[in-house]
């Protein structure tokens, strides 16, 4: 006579946990969440409706009910937490888990959800019933455990080669079977309570099939929640789509999810096949339908906003038709929102990775440019003051000069006051010859024609003093600024006082030298006879630092010349007088003209 009052959530919960669903329908689940949050007694009525669905004998219904309860716990706050931690709901879970007719995939799911809820409610002591029920279930069923994580084993070269062979074999089989492949008949939905359809599919693809490598799989779907226990592992929840990056261990792959990168076990995920051409066309058609209804939605909004509040909407056929036509695109719109939200997240992550890679590249490029590689052949190193440069071994005359780009180099402007003839040791990198004493012990000189240089500079505009016989290298290249150097008078002419004072001032800056400065504007008045290389090697370049293999001079160096005693800067010889092996004077035909025949210098 009296009928029980019908629960307002029975239809919504039954729709969200329908046994004919192939997977969780999040549109229906979110509708239940919104309804629970909107009504005062929504949490109590929703839990009562879920208790009824847990008593259903279909495993799909039981699994969908557990998923709905978890979604309510995540979205509806303390009200639903109190109802989930009630004695009636926990007893219903324990009865289902202890029933021997319950499917084997439902029992681990009950234990997994109760563990999550116990951890979620741990901060509130009023919800301790859930933790007690979880500990009771764990004690009564010690074998109920979530899938264990496989051990991490490094992939050997043989394993990689085997994966490659299996990949090639699978590709060959797919190419061979493609022409004869026939469309498979669609499977009718089963209403039996034995094995759920979604869990059957998950069981077949729970472990990634053998022969499948990270190179052939781009995406996987999580079958269970995974909490990392070690650094470097990727955390995910059931239903997450993970992008596969590479294969790291035997049963672990590396993937990316929500901007995080890490490894995950293969038995927690299932392979997602790449979309086919038909699926892509179907998605494009669905998007076209949604965008085609934009005008109707805007028109409906305009009509509703301009009409008066006294208008009866039910009597207006235009508004009713527009409403029903636009209502059909809501599920498609929600699906597209989820799809493009995921794509947006992926593009955002890709942009962040690109920015990081660009910054790393620019920093490395800047570091390499700030420290350029030194050239293999550069300027010769500077010889320390007081030590001679490298010279030829004793007893061997130096050969003809080679085409060396460093033979001639210009002195720096501040060092162009004096130019000294080159000696057998390497020139100073700063463009000047190391200073030497005014005189050294002279050995017996051979005849002038015993050793003649083989190279000269006939193309020179100025008659520079020719080189000594100690080296066959040409004179350093002169610069136009050489006109600033100190002139010297011809042989026998007195030295002007100003010039002598300037020369004395320069002698204070440099140690006294046995060679006079030269003038680019005047020809030399005396030449120097050639000397064998070994003669120069016997005299130290610096009087204060003798070379180790040379004996030091037996006498003290002469004093610095002063105004009282004016030493002759170079030997003065009368033309036509035989030199007797000492120095041979050379007089040009014209004092101020350039030497037209440089070969006449050596005679």
Curated annotation (Swiss-Prot):
It is a peripheral membrane protein. It comes from Neosartorya fischeri (strain ATCC 1020 / DSM 3700 / CBS 544.65 / FGSC A1164 / JCM 1740 / NRRL 181 / WB 181). Residues 162-181 form the UIM domain. Residues 215-274 form the SH3 domain. It comes from the Eukaryota. Gene3D superfamilies: 1.20.5.1940, 1.25.40.90, SH3 Domains. It is found in: Endosome membrane. This is Class E vacuolar protein-sorting machinery protein hse1. The keyword Transport applies. Residues 461-473, 586-603 have a biased composition (Polar residues). The keyword Transport applies.
